[in-house]
Amino acid sequence: MMYFDWNEEKNKQIKAERNVGFEDFVQAFNDDKILEIIAHFNKEKYPTQKLFIVELNEYIHYVPFVRDNEKYFLKNIIPSRKLHKLYKKDL
């Protein structure tokens, strides 16, 4: 069974800056709130990363991640005005 992992220091930083954390993402994932999984915008710089698109705190965020055979390693949680406009019109 796949599980989620992340850097705890990065999680603290994200919580302080954006008032959302990886635990919030995991809850959204478990509640089937993932809107889409897409390739990373910058495939040259991040060829092994993909992005979860998810609504957290009523705003669309993307969560870069790397997947291996046993886990998803979450890299960041980034609010996106562009994705918010794209996805919120459909929600």
Which residues are covered by each model-predicted region?
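Ribonuclease/tRNase effector modules and their secretory precursors
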Residues: 1-91
